[in-house]
Amino acid sequence: ESFTKKFKNVKHIEYDAVSESAVLDAHEIMYGVRALPFYNLDKANFILSLGADFLGDWMGSSYDKDYVKNRVPKKKNNGKAKMSRHIQIESNMSITGSNADVRIPLKPTRQKHVLAYIYSKLESNSFSVPDFEDSLKQKLDLLIDELVSNGKNSVVLCGHDDIDSQIISFRINEILKSEVKNRSKVSLLRKGDDKKLQNIIKDHENGTLGGIIMSGVNPVYSLPETMDFKSLLSNVDFSVNFSM
């Protein structure tokens, strides 16, 4: 901070090798804090995950310990055993998907339509949602019933790098009054902002980027080829990288 205060033409930008910018943006829009949400999965009786590999390295957090607590059948007062239900909707098989009670393979674009469909049903809105085949629609209606019946002990998790999808998932959890989403705790493991990173590329294209200083990162390796960061470094007057 002292460096940027002294040199007014310097900008400090953070980026994550695995971008969570969409979640950060959505959380800031919804709750006013640029941070990742945190979930208490030990409170969940019903989990609906759309592309969120939360038993892997999803958002840099470890959820497996909380998850397994409700995956062991527990006897209730009526003598019947109960455990949490987990539905995974995803395009490619993941660690999380392999542990789900039900796994529904679906393309990412269709998963976004599923989120919109669930939200429209819970909000009783009539906005346009693409049609689903009858078999899938029946499954989705049953999922919605389970979300509603479990109420505060249900949660929808979204793993898509898309602001709209993240906001819809947050809104669904608000409608459900989900206590699985922690209201007082957030994760600060990711801070990257894709928009600011894109601005560096634009500054370079406009000829207004004089130099770049990097610390502990390797953007040529970790950023998409479409950003062509290698070309950027080759054409600026000054570049330096501090590494361990």
Where are these regions (language model features)?
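Cofactor-pocket helix-loop regions in the catalytic cores of large enzyme subunits
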Residues: 1-244
